[in-house]
């Protein structure tokens, strides 16, 4: 395993630990999820480039599409919660139920 793979795995692990530690605020959770998706994208791109597996070359792009959708939904939820309650605590998400 090369140093680049170790760095990307470490970035994913740090983002996961950050998600587990700072899960009370929605903005912190979204930033940690974004770090996880970015490290997964870089890892998928490195795997495709190292293995020369041409059929899997679309996988990083599909991952970016899903990350963009996740980002848009997360930011819209953040705006809705902060406009409604004034804070971005995750515990306020339970109050949004009908």
UniProtKB/Swiss-Prot annotation:
EC identifiers of the protein: 7.1.1.2
Segments passing through the bilayer: 1-21, 25-45, 59-81
Name this protein carries in UniProt: NADH-ubiquinone oxidoreductase chain 4L
GO BP terms in the entry: ATP synthesis coupled electron transport
Gene that specifies this protein: MT-ND4L
Topological type in the membrane: Multi-pass membrane protein
Keywords: Electron transport, Membrane, Mitochondrion, Mitochondrion inner membrane, NAD, Respiratory chain, Translocase, Transmembrane, Transmembrane helix, Transport, Ubiquinone
Primary localisation category: mitochondrion
Origin: domain of life: Eukaryota
Pfam assignment, any one: Oxidored_q2
Gene Ontology, cellular component aspect: mitochondrial inner membrane; respiratory chain complex I
PANTHER family given in the database record: NADH-UBIQUINONE OXIDOREDUCTASE CHAIN 4L, NADH-UBIQUINONE OXIDOREDUCTASE SUBUNIT ND4L
The protein's enzyme class: translocase
């Amino acid at each position: 395993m090369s140093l680049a793979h170790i760095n990307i795995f470490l970035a994913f692990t740090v983002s996961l630990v950050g998600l587990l530690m700072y899960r009370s605020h929605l903005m912190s959770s979204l930033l940690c999820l974004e770090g996880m998706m970015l490290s997964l994208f870089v890892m998928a791109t490195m795997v495709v480039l190292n293995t020369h597996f041409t059929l899997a070359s679309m996988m990083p792009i599909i991952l970016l599409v899903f990350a963009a959708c996740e980002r848009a939904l997360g930011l819209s939820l953040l705006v809705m919660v902060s406009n409604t309650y004034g804070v971005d605590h995750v515990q306020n998400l339970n109050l949004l139920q009908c």
